[in-house]
Amino acid sequence: EMTAATLYATGRTLAGIQIYENMRCADYLQSRSDVDSGNLAITGTSGGGNQTMYAGALEDRFKAVIPVCSVGNYQAYLGVACCMCELLPGALSFTEEWGVLGLVAPRGLMVINATQDGIQFSVAEAKKSLAGAQVVFRQFGKPENIKHVVVESKHDYNQPMREAMYGWVTLHLKGEGDGSPITEPPMETVDRDLLRCFRQGDRPAGFQTVPMLAKRFATQMVRKQLKPLHKEHWEAQRVAKLGMIRRYVGKHSGRVEL
């Protein structure tokens, strides 16, 4: 959480970087000759589910979007401690979570929730968001392209959840089946080292951690800041600075309107 917080002073968020990376993954997949570049899907669970929701909303190359154990609604976030990578600053000033889900329309959206998950990702809270998003899908004439799947489970991405995803992806990417779950064949997971982009100790010399990236952003921004040359110059800066501070700390600077 402290790592994510290092970005805030630069006006960036960890969620933004993660979502950008998902979109760059789409670029990479479309560059490969062994990938059907017109048929991409995105899925993930928990924080990966949030990335799925936002990347799916922003990137229409994803024809099927399946967030897992992540959809609830923003108001439910207010009563619990959530990961900073899942938070969209100021979101409630312009939308609830249903509005983000609605941006996926009319593409295929399947939301998967677990019955024993935290309140912010609970079935009840997700249903509130699904209800709003369903209105948008109906306006596109595609009510069948949004589906809610509830699995008796804790916070997970287990086999029943994956099987639901397989059916949805098969329908929306291949045009086969009716979206019903597809049985997962027996499989063995590969060794984690085989999934590394770089072997242990073999990262490029120029790699950057999030704090390093934040420092780079900050250094670039500070270099562009000018000290006032005269009083009139300062008065112009003063108005601009006050406007920006009020934007971020609130118009009433600590007063709460009841």
Task: Report the location of each language-model feature.
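Cap/lid segment of the alpha/beta-hydrolase catalytic domain
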Residues: 1-26, 30-31, 71-86
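Short beta-alpha connecting loops at secondary-structure transitions
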Residues: 7-11, 84-93, 114-121, 148-153
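Alpha/beta-hydrolase fold nucleophile elbow
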Residues: 29, 34-46
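Alpha-helical scaffolding within the catalytic cores
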Residues: 50, 88-101, 132-134
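Conserved hydrolase catalytic core segment
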Residues: 57-64
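A short, hydrophobic beta-strand element of the alpha/beta-hydrolase
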Residues: 66-68
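Alpha/beta-hydrolase-fold serine-hydrolase catalytic core, especially in secreted/extracellular enzymes
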Residues: 99, 105, 109-258
